[in-house]
């Protein structure tokens, strides 16, 4: 009699770490229960990213995202998605020191069903990571192009183009791994150094704009489903013309209403 493996009820950090060098990790962003429920059976990881400040609230950057905003949207995502590993971004200013970071990370765990929190920064965040993990918080690291540093960097700039940057990125990755991060997001990093980091560290890397050699990939859902036509980063592949499809559907609806074709008899009560 053949033994069948029971489906995973909830993806854990152990499941993701076991995929290292074995199977690619599939990750996507989500900000509400509806899309989280749609994505649930198809992905390993859902990130409730502070990118929602741009794609959901139409702001120019992520910096004005608040802890309350992240908690609200994380609750919504957790209500819709039951299986994926759910990561909540710690917004700008929410981990400026250990006391503040611990307070906000504990709120994420107490008030939502998130699996982990994510913070941006390299080896300078190692001590903070240790403090959080010592309290039982799973931390996901994020190095390379860091959106919360966009004003300091003078824009969204690819990292790893010179030897100095490459050395720092590798040092950051190794330091964060030693400090206890469970996963590491590599954003906007040149392919060779992203590959080297992935090979050097034992924890999985999840890339966005960092080449195909990372242990997994993540995209902002509204980018990959074609909801924005004003700007598309080089690394984004559109799998759907979502904006066009929805606008066409709304046009048909409006046309039916104007012509008196909606609702019809079958859609009315008598």
Swiss-Prot record:
GO terms for cellular component: cytoplasm. Mg(2+) binds at residues 50, 89, 120. The gene is panB. This is 3-methyl-2-oxobutanoate hydroxymethyltransferase. Belongs to the PanB family. Binds 1 Mg(2+) ion per subunit. It comes from Helicobacter pylori (strain ATCC 700392 / 26695). It is an enzyme of class 2 (transferase). GO terms for molecular function: 3-methyl-2-oxobutanoate hydroxymethyltransferase activity; magnesium ion binding.
């Amino acid at each position: 009699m053949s033994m069948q493996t029971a489906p995973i009820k909830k993806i854990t950090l152990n499941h993701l770490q076991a995929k290292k060098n074995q199977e690619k990790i599939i990750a996507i962003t989500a900000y509400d229960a509806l899309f989280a429920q749609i994505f649930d059976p198809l992905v390993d990881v859902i990130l409730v990213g502070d990118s929602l400040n741009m794609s959901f609230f139409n702001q120019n950057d992520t910096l004005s995202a608040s802890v309350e905003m992240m908690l609200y949207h994380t609750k919504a995502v957790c209500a819709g998605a039951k299986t994926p590993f759910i990561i909540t971004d710690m917004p700008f200013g929410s981990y400026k020191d250990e006391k503040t970071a611990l307070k906000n990370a504990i709120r994420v765990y107490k008030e939502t069903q998130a699996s982990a929190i994510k913070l941006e920064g390299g080896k300078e965040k190692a001590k903070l990571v240790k403090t959080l993990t010592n309290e039982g918080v799973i931390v996901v690291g994020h190095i390379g192009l860091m959106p919360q540093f966009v004003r300091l960097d003078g824009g969204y700039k690819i990292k790893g183009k010179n030897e100095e940057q490459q050395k720092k990125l590798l040092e950051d990755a190794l330091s964060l791994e030693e400090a206890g991060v469970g996963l590491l997001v590599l954003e906007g990093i040149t392919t060779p150094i992203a590959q080297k980091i992935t090979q050097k560290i034992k924890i999985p890397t999840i890339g966005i704009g960092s080449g195909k050699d990372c242990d997994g990939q993540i995209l902002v859902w509204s980018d990959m489903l074609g909801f924005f036509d004003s700007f598309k980063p080089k690394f984004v592949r559109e799998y759907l013309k979502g904006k066009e499809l929805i606008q066409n559907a709304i046009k048909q609806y409006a046309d039916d209403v104007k012509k008196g074709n909606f609702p019809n008899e079958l859609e009315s009560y008598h």
